[in-house]
Amino acid sequence: MLAASFKRQPSQLVRGLGAVLRTPTRIGHVRTMATLKTTDKKAPEDIEGSDTVQIELPESSFESYMLEPPDLSYETSKATLLQMYKDMVIIRRMEMACDALYKAKKIRGFCHLSVGQEAIAVGIENAITKLDSIITSYRCHGFTFMRGASVKAVLAELMGRRAGVSYGKGGSMHLYAPGFYGGNGIVGAQVPLGAGLAFAHQYKNEDACSFTLYGDGASNQGQVFESFNMAKLWNLPVVFCCENNKYGMGTAASRSSAMTEYFKRGQYIPGLKVNGMDILAVYQASKFAKDWCLSGKGPLVLEYETYRYGGHSMSDPGTTYRTRDEIQHMRSKNDPIAGLKMHLIDLGIATEAEVKAYDKSARKYVDEQVELADAAPPPEAKLSILFEDVYVKGTETPTLRGRIPEDTWDFKKQGFASRD
């Protein structure tokens, strides 16, 4: 029964919230304790029996470029904070399971984990609706879960099983869900696609925007700047989100970028930098960014300052280009899950014992999902499967060409069209 409470529910539009919250946060070398107070005012979307809280963010939470930063005060429900905590714990347990499965050689190939960066996926999802689009780089497992995929479907895909979100054909870098367009294995290639998603929203007069995520390592790609230009030229509702985790593979940002204030890279596009280790600040900044785009102001560059605890990928120990002391300092002083846990206890949303029970239930739930994913069969070893899953089901063409014309597949015949 406990496991059922961790099933990801579709996000709903949060209305009537002001701006940001205050939490223990650290930007650069500044660490500040937030102040919070309960309020009697209830938002209409609050679930029955829950109270709202007023959250005050430290002044160091944001740094802006060509715009006024978000408010440092906003109101949200206790239920929302609790759900965000549960989601971050699930994502971390899922990533830890990926680590173990990779080491057990059940996951092969590329695998990029986001342990330490959970606040970004969870904070964004709580600030938007299912009408909005998200597209990311290859570090995408948490986003896939937050967009509605099950832990089982994510892990099954990583293990090459038919129950995976891409039917076992995509692997770690090619995960998809409704409103989530991947996962992209080419550095920076998702950015122009994200601009295209924003154009589609604009063309169809949809009340939605595109959150297009890329890393500091991709920020110097030419196609990123080309996308900036097109987005500003056409006033597209796109939020260019730079996940600055300080290292592009094993190269520190300062060694690869002449200017590391990525939120200012848009030049003619306003920008905002936010403490990406603080989910409450991430939520407020993301909501601000969406409101900015939908108000007709055009694109926005949003930089999330974050940190990955592990290496670039499973083949990288992550300790040859940074010290263990640096990693431990970030874990002990800036962990997004530990920070939100403190708020849950301080606000009386949950006791220490209840939080431990949530953690235990999350561990049990993910373990069960691992077993289900591991038990799922791989794609059937038949020739026709190479030509399946190209088109949306129900829209398939009668034939599909392969590498050469002679390799054209006939779906009705279930064989090559030009062969007996």
From Swiss-Prot:
Known regulation of activity: E1 activity is regulated by phosphorylation (inactivation) and dephosphorylation (activation) of the alpha subunit.
Entry GO MF terms: metal ion binding; pyruvate dehydrogenase (acetyl-transferring) activity
UniProt key word Lipid biosynthesis: no
UniProt keyword annotation of Repeat present: no
EC number: 1.2.4.1
Pfam families: E1_dh
Keywords annotated in UniProt: Magnesium, Metal-binding, Mitochondrion, Oxidoreductase, Phosphoprotein, Pyruvate, Thiamine pyrophosphate, Transit peptide
Transit peptide: 1-33
Subcellular location: Mitochondrion matrix
Membrane-spanning residues: none
CDD domains found in the cross-reference section: TPP_E1_PDC_ADC_BCADC (cd02000)
Residues with the Phosphoserine modification: 313
Annotated binding of pyruvate, by residue: 112, 138-139, 177, 185, 187, 216-218, 245, 247
Reaction catalyzed: N(6)-[(R)-lipoyl]-L-lysyl-[protein] + pyruvate + H(+) = N(6)-[(R)-S(8)-acetyldihydrolipoyl]-L-lysyl-[protein] + CO2
GO biological process: pseudohyphal growth; pyruvate decarboxylation to acetyl-CoA
GO cellular component, one term: pyruvate dehydrogenase complex
Requisite cofactors: thiamine diphosphate; Mg(2+)
Residues annotated to bind Mg(2+): 216, 245, 247
Other facts: Present with 100000 molecules/cell in log phase SD medium.
PANTHER family: PYRUVATE DEHYDROGENASE E1 COMPONENT SUBUNIT ALPHA, PYRUVATE DEHYDROGENASE E1 COMPONENT, ALPHA SUBUNIT BACTERIAL AND ORGANELLAR
Assembly notes: Pyruvate dehydrogenase (E1) is a tetramer of 2 alpha and 2 beta subunits. Eukaryotic pyruvate dehydrogenase (PDH) complexes are organized as a core consisting of the oligomeric dihydrolipoamide acetyl-transferase (E2), around which are arranged multiple copies of pyruvate dehydrogenase (E1), dihydrolipoamide dehydrogenase (E3) and protein X (E3BP) bound by non-covalent bonds.
Role according to the record: The pyruvate dehydrogenase complex catalyzes the overall conversion of pyruvate to acetyl-CoA and CO(2).
Protein name: Pyruvate dehydrogenase E1 component subunit alpha, mitochondrial
Organism this protein belongs to: Saccharomyces cerevisiae (strain ATCC 204508 / S288c)
Name of the gene this protein is made from: PDA1
